[in-house]
């Protein structure tokens, strides 16, 4: 059995904290670690981290909040901050990021991503 990979917007700083607390109280808990046993403990997809990487050098992006990303990506703000709508919007943002990545990654290669071709350490 492979544990599901959790995905969310600011999942590491918010959602997983709550998941861990609720699992400690109600279960399931990993007997060895005492941590939640619902999701993968290794892999997580924090959409906000991905947004930061894609937008850090864009002067037009003033904030990476969910509200700002809804506006930037043309998503409706109707029902914003409703839990289910936030999940749907997060999924749509992740899908847009993945499609953008796929489109870009077919045109460039990592070894040519640096200005002079050298890798920095």
Listing of model-derived features with the role each one plays in the protein:
Residues 1-121:
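Metal-dependent phosphoesterase core characteristic of DEDDh/y 3'-5' exonuclease domains
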């Amino acid at each position: 059995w492979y544990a599901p990979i959790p995905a969310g917007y600011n999942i590491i700083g918010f959602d997983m904290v709550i998941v861990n607390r609720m699992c400690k109280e109600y279960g399931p808990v990993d007997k060895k670690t005492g941590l939640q046993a619902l999701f993968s403990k290794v892999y997580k997809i924090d959409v906000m981290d991905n947004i930061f990487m894609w937008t850090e050098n864009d002067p037009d992006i003033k904030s990476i909040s969910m509200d700002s990303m809804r506006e930037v990506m043309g998503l409706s703000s109707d029902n914003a901050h409703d839990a289910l709508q936030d999940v749907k919007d997060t999924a749509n943002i992740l899908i847009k990021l993945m499609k953008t990545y796929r489109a870009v990654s077919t045109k460039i290669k990592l070894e040519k991503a640096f200005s002079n071709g050298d890798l920095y350490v």
